[in-house]
């Protein structure tokens, strides 16, 4: 029997939603999920390994990849370019791995256009008040930055109807179980299992 193709799982949500915590809890004990590796023009930091943290490329190579449509999405951030290489994602999916892409809404919509079969998951806190509380509890952001992030969060919420699932992260353990359940449910869909029906007399 041919190896079942993996799923591309796109996760988005506002800063402070707890995406990283939820995902890391959900990944505990699983070996069927890997994070996507982005290409970047940023210089490697001490200890970073090419192909592990990022694929490090120069600007000319990055532009060539853009022109050749080699990215599922790409964007510029703090004077550096970042992109999700199609080839890496396709290789992992063909190996049966579920590929996790934690990305902001604009990039997620780019991915959805190129791979409509991607599983789109939006993680949010139980309320905007809770989101603001979490941002302030960090104690690292200025008032201006917090206000900007809250405005950005409202803009991201407006794009949530492009997503397949919404996880309300009021409890990280519960949210992680919901995330794992989503992956399980995706493999139980009719189109993936309809061949078994032909075996019924």
Model feature map: region roles:
Residues 27-36:
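Post-Walker A helix-loop "phosphate-sensing" segment adjacent to the P-loop in P-loop NTPases
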Residues 99-104, 113-137:
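Conserved phosphate-donor/acceptor-positioning beta-strand/loop module used by diverse small-molecule
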Residues 40-99, 106:
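ATP-dependent small-molecule kinase phosphotransfer cores
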Residues 2, 140-141, 155-201:
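NTP-dependent small-molecule kinase module
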Residues 19:
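Conserved lysine of the Walker
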Residues 1-8, 31:
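Extreme N-terminal, non-catalytic leader segments
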Residues 22-23:
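Post-Walker A alpha-helix
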Residues 12-14:
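P-loop (Walker A) phosphate-binding loop of NTP-binding proteins
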């Amino acid at each position: 029997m041919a190896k079942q193709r993996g799923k591309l799982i796109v996760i988005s949500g506002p800063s402070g939603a707890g995406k990283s915590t939820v995902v890391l809890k959900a990944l505990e004990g699983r070996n069927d999920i890997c994070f996507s590796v982005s290409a970047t023009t940023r210089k490697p930091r001490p200890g970073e390994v090419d192909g592990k943290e990022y694929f490090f490329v120069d600007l000319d190579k990055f532009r060539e990849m853009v022109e050749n449509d080699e990215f599922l999405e790409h964007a510029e951030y703090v004077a550096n370019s970042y992109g999700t290489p199609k080839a890496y994602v396709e290789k992992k999916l063909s190996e049966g791995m579920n590929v996790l892409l934690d990305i902001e809404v604009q990039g997620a919509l780019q991915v959805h256009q190129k791979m409509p079969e991607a599983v789109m998951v939006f993680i949010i806190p139980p309320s905007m008040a809770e989101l603001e509380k979490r941002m302030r509890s960090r104690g690292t952001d200025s008032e201006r930055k917090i206000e900007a992030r809250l405005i950005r969060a409202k803009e991201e919420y407006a794009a949530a109807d492009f997503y397949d699932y919404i996880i309300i992260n009021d409890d990280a353990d519960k949210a992680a179980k919901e995330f794992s359940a989503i992956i399980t449910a995706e493999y139980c869909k009719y189109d993936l299992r309809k061949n078994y029906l032909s075996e019924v007399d």
